[in-house]
Amino acid sequence: YKILPTAKDYKRIGEGDTGLNTGGMGAISPVPFADTAFTDKIEHQIVKPTVEGLKMDNLPYVGFIFIGLIKVGDEPKVIEYNVRMGDPETEVVIPRLQSDLVEVLLAMAKGTLDQIDLNIDERAATTVMAVSGGYPEAYEKGKEITGTENIKDSLVFHAGTKISDGKVRKSHGTNNNST
């Protein structure tokens, strides 16, 4: 297995992590409080036992395992497992991966992941979600989204958008995020 960079999402709609819960209003990587001692605990107390448990139960798995954690005191605690990457965490993790993602995926599929090294950009990444007015409750759909073509030196990830009449429009509560 390989461990990708840590990431933390921000779920609440309001400033200062207030208001209603959402699917994620943004994320950062690396996680400021996840120092080497803490990430070592994660690997030894959670990641290794998870991988070993899958092997012991004869459950072959090839792919991503996203482990959602909280920090209780100085201890990591699992709150969820997903067999996909998280959103919006992916949008701050993948841009930090300097290794060729296709090569990583091929190595996973071939069972040769142990033969590659992951090169990680040491710089931090932040993503902020743009959402429809009213989200996460009743929100507008169909309005045109403009201005993303003017964003420089950042990545724009679309989600909840569609192209209609040659224009990018809102089709869901979360529309895009910039990293």
Which residues fall in each region the model found?
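Internal nucleotide-binding/catalytic subdomain
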Residues: Y1-T90
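Active-site/binding-pocket entry motifs
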Residues: D9-R12, G134, K162-I163
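Short clusters of hydrophobic/aromatic residues that line enzyme substrate/ligand-binding pockets
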Residues: M25-I28, I145-T148, V156
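Short, well-ordered beta-strand elements within core beta-sheets of diverse protein domains
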Residues: A27-P30, T127-M129, N175-T179
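Active-site "cap" helix and flanking loop/linker of ATP-utilizing ligase/carboxylase catalytic domains
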Residues: E43-I65, N82-I151, S164-G166
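Hydrophobic side chains in beta-strands
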Residues: K71, M129-V131, H158
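Internal helix-turn-beta structural module
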Residues: K152-T179
